[in-house]
Amino acid sequence: AFKQLSKIYDTYVLSAAPWENPSAWSDKLNWVKNYLGKEAYKRLILSHNKHLNSGDYLIDDRKANGAEHFPGQHIYFGKDEFPDWKSVCDYLISQSI
């Protein structure tokens, strides 16, 4: 999904990690490197204040860490309207036309 949407949008990976688990930060970075590749590696933002980032869309499976106050549209991943990545990609591709 990241690679597909990156062809259309200026995409970033915005994630939070527990403060009390320092290895979680490096674990997230390694996960992005391994699964999303070098294109995403330098587009990783780790923040507990997601609402401070600007953008048109935030895809998140939670409303925590500022997602509920994000200034663009929060695509609530895993819920009724967006149960999977196909539904998210289909929606975002339709919005780009």
Language-model segment annotations:
Residues 1-26, 32:
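Substrate-recognition element of Asp-dependent hydrolases with the DxDx(T/V) motif
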Residues 56-57, 62-97:
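Asp-based, Mg2+/Mn2+-dependent phosphohydrolase catalytic module
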Residues 1-4, 48, 68-70:
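A short acidic, amphipathic alpha-helical/loop segment
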Residues 37-56:
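Donor nucleotide-activated moiety binding/catalytic core segment of transferases
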Residues 19, 52, 82:
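Surface-exposed, flexible loop/turn segments at secondary-structure boundaries
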Residues 14-16, 47-48, 59-62:
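Short His-Asn-centered micro-motif
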Residues 25-36, 67-71:
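Short, aromatic/basic amphipathic alpha-helical patches
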